[in-house]
Amino acid sequence: MASRRIYCDKTELVLVVVGKNRVSTVNLRYDEIVSIRFQRCKEIRFFWPVSSERIVITTRKSDKPFIYTKYREKKFFNEYKQELAKFAKENNVTFYNEL
């Protein structure tokens, strides 16, 4: 069963990050987020590159951005996009919709 990996609160995001060896949880207040981007990308599906979308969250806490792709988050991806767009607007976080 799939589970959510991005949770939005009024002023905070909770990100579940799945690594190679472990799963970690990152709490981010709105002032720690530099930008939220929706971008087009290519994703490998069954040995072929396919057009896809991704969410990129850049923060002050981490050197690397947090990336969530459409095919890995298939069940919740559209909900993530709606919630993050609303979160960015309400908390004055820089938001780019590059789709």
What are these language model-derived features?
Residues 34-99:
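Acidic, Ser/Thr- and proline-rich intrinsically disordered linker/docking segments
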Residues 1-27:
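Conserved beta-hairpin
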